[in-house]
Amino acid sequence: MAQTQTSTTGNLQKMSRIMLTKARYTEEHNMPVVALIDRINLANGHYQLDIPKVAQMTASDLVDGEDFLDSEEISPSIVSATAAEVGIKVIVTDRLLRQNNESVFSIIGRQMGEAMARKKDTDAIALFSGFSTSYGADNALFNLANISGVIGNAKNNLIGTDFIVHHPLAVWKMTSTVNNLLGTYTLPDAFQKPPVKEFWSGIKLSGVPIFEDGNISKNSNDSGYGVIASKDAMGYLVASGKTERRQRDESLRATEVVIVEEYGMFEADDSRGAALLYDFPDAGAAATS
């Protein structure tokens, strides 16, 4: 009996290592919005992060020998961000451990990673509709004319234009007409990393790369919110990275494996992003014609 328990314990450690490795890799490659925005680590012992925001200042012409006529007031507003725990639990039976099947452990890890990535990404996507500025409307087309206008307005109003994110079915409407025209352009250096590059549509309009995210949900009118923003418009606050916890359940003859993280998604600067409400109906009919 002692020998069996030792074997099971060793298999559990091996299983945990495989699952966590696969979960981390899968998560990193399945949350495009999280990879596009600023990541901030919360210092140990701190409950929340306070970010001061100072209003735009104006520089003035000076006259030699004369004092400044104008002075700028510093009246910062504060954006506060907090984190909360998010996790997932998997019950691993002794029988599964005895089989010692690495493929099964890898599949479990992938599913755990996909679940955590989906949770983080949808938390970040939920910020899109909260921006004060919004372009588009229900059933409006995500086409070249409309999105070119969005970019022009965003630049005119000093809204961030580091990236655009929308649902693949919205971007699909534009892709066939502009790929040949814009295919020679490349991504900015800041986004030249695998987890982000994988979600680039291949389109860049007026210097703004367009990314796809299938986690964006639609409303009853087949429309949904994307975003045009700078990296610092939204933030991903990390209070604690992945931690693994195990608890033995003898009646189940199994071990509960719990993965927990503590993080928060927050809007850092309302003036640096805008919501994009555009249509993305099912492409099934067009794809089969």
What role is predicted for each listed range?
Residues 93-160, 276-289:
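Alpha-helical scaffold segments that mediate packing/assembly in large oligomeric complexes
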Residues 241-289:
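Extended, compositionally biased alpha-helical segments that mediate assembly or anchoring
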Residues 145, 152-239:
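Extended oligomerization regions of viral-like shell subunits
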Residues 100-107, 223, 245, 249:
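Short alpha-helix boundary/capping segments
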Residues 59-62, 100-101, 173-176, 266-268:
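Short helix/loop capping segments that flank catalytic or ligand/cofactor-binding pockets
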Residues 77-99:
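Short acidic, glycine/tyrosine-flanked loop/strand segments centered on an H-E-D-like triad
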Residues 1-76, 234, 287:
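N-terminal "assembly arms/tails" that initiate or stabilize quaternary assembly
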